[in-house]
């Protein structure tokens, strides 16, 4: 009997912020992932890198201040670095948790490049905030380098483009490992954004929305289910208002209607809903669960969360 294929998208809550936090958080996350594996799902994992890529970007910028002759580190390289060290902790935590349960399955992290459109309007309207708060002097220095900054509370922040994912370069490798019943960590942080130039791939100065990348990954893998872990238990209507209403189920048509009404926050729930709609499409089989990871890492699919179907 063919196993059901599931893609699990981990939010930054499932990873922590600092290195010690990440070590502990990945242990809890591994328990939830192991539950799916024990129930005989074919599992592929993707994850956020919000705090981590910001720390890497800041660290590399500070390094360049000490050594001006050093070439500034591109965003695409920062993305690759974040995939490496988050994947390292994740795959080891999952491997250990599986062995504790008497299950042996190889766990691998694939450095993943995601193709974006050079004409994506996001390149003309950068919106994704990265890195620490900058002083006015530092902000001016960034602008002289050709980077975009925006004034925020307490100072300035650098902003970069967040283009939509078009294709995944390493999808065949991910499929091969997954079909061999191995656990795969891929498309970390939305993937390394790249532009196609003939036979070459060139890193783009951008970050990809990780929920949309998770949806694209699930689509290309022809997965049965996409699980998006976030900071809230359910998708809610009128979120944060006195008449807030959590939803246990939602259809694609209902999701589209709620989007038109402006129910979902941009950069928050909206990309998750967009990912769900894109992944499910016209399929009567595919489904998306949006929910929160329990603090103890216990089973995340016991009737909690919001299930989205056609």
Name each model-derived stretch:
Residues 2-310:
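C-terminal catalytic "cap/lid" subdomain
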């Amino acid at each position: 009997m063919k196993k059901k294929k599931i893609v699990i998208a981990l939010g930054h809550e499932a990873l922590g912020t600092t290195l010690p936090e990440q070590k502990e958080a990945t242990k809890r996350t591994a328990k939830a992932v192991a539950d799916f594996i024990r129930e005989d799902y074919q599992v592929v994992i993707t994850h956020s890198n919000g705090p981590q890529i910001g720390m890497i970007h800041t660290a590399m910028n500070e390094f360049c201040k000490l050594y001006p002759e050093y070439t500034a580190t591109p965003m695409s390289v920062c993305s690759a670095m974040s995939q490496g060290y988050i994947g390292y902790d994740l795959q080891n935590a999952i491997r250990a948790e599986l062995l504790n349960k008497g299950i042996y399955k190889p766990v691998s992290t694939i450095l993943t490049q995601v193709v974006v459109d050079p004409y994506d309007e996001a390149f003309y309207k950068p919106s994704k905030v990265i890195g620490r708060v900058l002083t006015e002097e530092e902000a001016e220095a960034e602008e002289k380098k050709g980077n975009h900054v925006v004034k925020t509370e307490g100072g300035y922040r650098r902003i970069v483009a967040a283009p939509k994912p078009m294709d995944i370069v390493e999808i065949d490798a991910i499929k091969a490992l997954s079909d061999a019943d191995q656990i795969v960590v891929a498309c970390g942080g939305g993937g390394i954004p790249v532009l196609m130039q003939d036979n070459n791939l060139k890193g783009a100065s951008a970050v990809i929305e990780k929920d949309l990348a998770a949806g694209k990954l699930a689509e290309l893998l022809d997965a049965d289910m996409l699980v998006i872990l976030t900071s809230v238990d359910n998708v809610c209507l009128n979120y944060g208002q006195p008449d807030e209403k959590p939803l246990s189920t939602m259809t694609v048509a209902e999701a589209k209607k709620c989007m038109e009404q402006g129910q979902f926050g941009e950069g928050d729930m909206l990309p998750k809903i967009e990912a769900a709609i894109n992944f499910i499409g016209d399929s009567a089989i595919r489904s998306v669960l949006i929910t929160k990871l329990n603090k103890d890492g216990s089973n995340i699919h016991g009737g909690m969360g919001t299930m989205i179907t056609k």
